[in-house]
Amino acid sequence: MLTIKRFTCNMLQENCYVISDDTKECVICDCGAYSQHERQSIIDYIKELQLKPVHLIATHGHIDHNFGNNTIYEQYGLRPEVHKEDEHLMEMLDKQAEGLVNVTLDYQMPNPVYFDENHVIRFGTHEFTIIETPGHSPGSVFFY
């Protein structure tokens, strides 16, 4: 059985999800946690449930879905996984932050891992396939 915990994050009210199963492995999806409180809430939830994060995935490469990637990388060693068509967006997260929400990032983002529609996200006894849904961004995806 899957457990899905939602965290509403940042000034744009983006939703971050921690998705886990009975094995305690989990996936963090769209970690838009901006404030220290938001970041700590996600870490505390993972600790409280004794989860083991194995993937940090993003539905697309906009900054509001990626603000917290550095914290997840520092805590768990996970690099963000995003569709290869959003590589250009991931390379300019700092510019997105300045232009979209007038924020200067004072930290370095981890280098992403890029995937395509043939990639499968495996965790515990579950897996997500990638469904390409370009439009919002060239690399927008659903995980199914």
Regions found by a protein language model. Give the residues of each.
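Short Pro/Gly-enriched beta-strand edge/turn motifs at strand-loop
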Residues: 1-3, 100-103, 124-128
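Short Gly/Pro-enriched turn/cap motifs at secondary-structure boundaries
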Residues: 7-8, 104, 110-112, 131-134
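Active-site HxH/HxHxD metal-binding segment of metal-dependent hydrolases
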Residues: 34-39, 43-122
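Divalent metal-coordination and catalytic microenvironments
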Residues: 19, 30, 60, 72, ...
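Short, glycine/acidic-enriched loop or turn micro-motifs at the edges of active sites
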Residues: 24, 33, 63, 86, ...
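Conserved beta-strand hairpin/beta-sheet module of binuclear metal-dependent hydrolase folds
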Residues: 1-49, 142-144
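Core dinuclear metal-dependent hydrolase active-site scaffold
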Residues: 120-144
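Structural motif
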Residues: 25-27, 52-55, 126
